[in-house]
Amino acid sequence: MPKLAVVLLVLLILPLSYFDAAGGQAVQGDRRGNGLARYLQRNGRDNEAECQIDTPGSSWGKCCMTRMCGTMCCSRSVCTCVYHWRRGHGCSCPG
């Protein structure tokens, strides 16, 4: 089998959810539903974890341990999410 065909086959087999261009961490929930996403949304362990489920009924989502802003993950929990005209959402952090 040519190298290109092998590479394409591997890329088709790997789930695209492993790759997150938005900067957040893609995580997999348990097989019984979105248990991990629900756990992270409970804001346990003194963090402000937020999860965005990609599609309803899916166990895949982007979870951020600070603050979600659109599809981005802000660097700190004190940051606020703002919308810039023509540039989209962005994080505004004090100091």
From Swiss-Prot:
Q: Where in the cell is it found?
A: Secreted
Q: Where is the signal peptide?
A: 1-24
In the record, 4-carboxyglutamate modifications are located at E50
List residues, modification 4-hydroxyproline: P56
**MF annotations from Gene Ontology:** acetylcholine receptor inhibitor activity; ion channel regulator activity; toxin activity
Per the record, the major location class is secreted
Q: Which domain of life is it from?
A: Eukaryota
Q: Where in the body, by tissue, does this protein show up?
A: Expressed by the venom duct.
In the UniProt record, which is one GO cellular component term?
A: extracellular region
Pro-segment residues? 25-45
**Bridged cysteine pairs (disulfide):** C64-C73, C69-C81, C74-C91, C79-C93
Listed A to Z, the keywords are: Acetylcholine receptor inhibiting toxin, Disulfide bond, Gamma-carboxyglutamic acid, Hydroxylation, Ion channel impairing toxin, Neurotoxin, Postsynaptic neurotoxin, Secreted, Signal, Toxin
Question: Regarding domains, what does the record say?
Answer: The cysteine framework is XX (C-CC-C-CC-C-C-C-C).
Query: Which family, according to UniProt?
Result: Belongs to the conotoxin D superfamily.
Its biological purpose is as follows: Alpha-conotoxins act on postsynaptic membranes, they bind to the nicotinic acetylcholine receptors (nAChR) and thus inhibit them. Through its two C-terminal domains, this homodimeric protein would bind to two nAChR allosteric sites, located outside the nAChR C-loop of the principal binding face and at the adjacent binding interface in a clockwise direction. This toxin specifically blocks mammalian neuronal nAChR of the alpha-7/CHRNA7, alpha-3-beta-2/CHRNA3-CHRNB2 and alpha-4-beta-2/CHRNA4-CHRNB2 subtypes.
Query: What interactions and quaternary structure are annotated?
Result: Hetero-, homo- or pseudo-homodimer (identical sequence, different post-translational modifications).
Q: What is the official name of this protein in its record?
A: Alpha-conotoxin-like Cp20.5
This chain's source organism reads: Conus capitaneus
